[in-house]
C-alpha cells in the first residue's frame, strides 16, 4: 500500500509539473497550496538569472526529490527544500569544477577536500569502478612556464615511480583540445588525510605506530633513490595517510632526477624543501654535490616530529635554523666545515661558539632506544655519515620486520624522459609535452597520435546531458532503479561518447575485409545516428579471451591502465573488431575499447527512409543488424577499458612490484579489518597497531 501511495504521489507531481504547477495540500494534505514557481523561489532565493538558467535542468529532480522526502505527511518542507538545494548546488559545483571536460560523466563529485594556489582537490566516486578517488584540478597551468614544468615533472615521475608507498595516478582526463587547454584534471587514489594531521590529532600513538610509519617511508625512499630521483621536499604534509596506518609519499613537483653525466648531480640552485625539514647542506648550498642524503635528513626530521608531536627544527630563517641544528647536534667538526661551499656559511660556523651535542635519550625520554640510535644516524650533520635508505632498513630497529632483499628497486629512468629539464621551452612546448603525458592514460588515442592519425578536438556529451540521463532513468524506473543509466539499451544504438579519429588499419580489423566498398566513401564521421548500420563491440564476458599483459618498458603505465585485457588483438571476437551482437539477447552494456558504425557514401531520400525503417525493425526485433555493403568502417568511440567492471589488471608476474605486493602479509597484520604494524615469525609476541583517528585536510 505504501508503495502504491508513493507511485500515486509521483504521478500527481508529474501531472502538476506538466500543468505548470501543483498544490501541496492536494498531494500531501499537509501544506498550503504553492505553485512550482514559488517552490523554485524557495529553493533558489535571489540568485541571478544566469545561475537559475544553469540549474534549470535540475528543476524536475528537485520536485521528485521533494516528493520522495514528503511521503510522510509530518515531514518538514523547509528541511526538504534545503536538502534539495544542497544536492542541486553540488551538481552545479561539479559542472563548474569540470567545465567542458567530457570525463565529468564518469565521476560524481562529493566534496572539496583541499584548496591552494594550484587549484582544487575534490573527492569523487568513479561511476565505472564504484571506487572513491581524489580529483586534483590544476587551473591555468600555462600562466607561468615554471609552474607548468613542475606539473609536467610531477605527473611524469608519478607515472614512472609505481610503488605501494607512493601515491598513484589512476587517470588523467583528456582535454577537449590539445592545442589550447588550460586546466588538467588528475585522478588520484583517495587518501583520508596526511601525516601532519595524524600527528596533530593523535597523542596516543604507540611504538608500533612509530616503527611502521618509519618503515614505510624508508621503503618508499629506497625505491625512489634507486631510480636516482631526489624528492627534495619531504615533510608531513606531503605524506598522505589512511586510518589503517598506510602512508604514501606525494608531491614530486620539486623532485629531480640525477644523471651521472649531467650537471644536476653537481649543483642545484633553485629553492628546495620547506626550511624546517631542509638538510644542513641545503641551508647554505654547503656541498658541491648533493646526494640522496638530503631526503634521509628530512625523514629524520619527520620521524622526530612523530615521536614528539612537534617540529624538531622550526627555524625562522636560515641562521636560526642552523642554530637549532647545532644546539641539538653540536658544532660540526672542522673537517666538515672545511668542505662548506658557501663562504659566508663557512665563516659563520667557524666563528660559532663550541656546542656539545645533546643526548637523544634526554631530548626524547620516552622513545625506544633502538629508534633513537637510528634517528641519530639519520640526523648526522655531515651527509656522508647518514645511511642510505637501504642501509637504514637493515638497522636493528626493524629486526623481524624488514626483509631488505624483498623490497623492490626501480629501474633507472631514461635520460630522454627528462630532456626538457635541460632546455628552455615555451608554453606551447610544455603544453605538448603535458598532452603526451595525458595520452599515456589513453592508449588507443596515444597510438593514433604517434601514427599521425590524431585529431585536435574531441567531442563528449556534457555533464548536464549525463545528469538528464540519470534523471530520466530514475523516472522510467519509478525511482526503484539505479541513477546511472546503461550505456545503451539496444546493441544497435550508437554509443554516447564520440572521439574523432581515423579508422584502424585493415590489419587490425579482422572482420572488416568483408565490408570493403567498391564505391567512393565519405571520411566524415556519421552525424545522423539514425542513418547507419549498428555493430556492437560488446561481447559477453564468457566469449572473451583473457590476455596477459606483456612486460613493458620503464615509464609505461602498467597494471590498472593496461588497455585490452579482455580480448586479444588477434581475436576476431575481441573488443577491437567490428562484431555483430544481434544474436545475443539484450543485456546491460559495458564500455569496450571500440564499437563500429558504417558511414554511407551517398544516400538519397528513399535510401534514408529505407534505412530508418530497417533501423527501427532492428531495434524492435533484435535480429541481424542492418548494414550497407558499400560503406566504410570508421571508429565510433574510444573508451577507457579501465572503467569496465570486468577489467582486471595483469602486470608482469615476474615484476618486482608484483612480488612485493604478494608479500605484504609478511610485514602487516590485520587488526579489526585494518592494517596494523608489521611483525614477523621471529618476534616472540604479536605486536599490534590500532586504527589512527584522522581528519580531512589539504591533500595532494
Curated annotation (Swiss-Prot):
GO MF terms here are: ATP binding; MAP kinase activity; protein serine kinase activity; protein serine/threonine kinase activity
Checking PANTHER family in the record gives: MITOGEN-ACTIVATED PROTEIN KINASE
Q: What class of enzyme is it?
A: transferase
Q: Which gene encodes it?
A: MPK9
Q: Which organism is it from?
A: Oryza sativa subsp. japonica (Rice)
- Record's protein name: Mitogen-activated protein kinase 9
Modified residues annotated as Phosphotyrosine in this record: 271
Reactions listed under catalytic activity = L-seryl-[protein] + ATP = O-phospho-L-seryl-[protein] + ADP + H(+); L-threonyl-[protein] + ATP = O-phospho-L-threonyl-[protein] + ADP + H(+)
Keyword Nucleotide-binding among UniProt keywords? yes
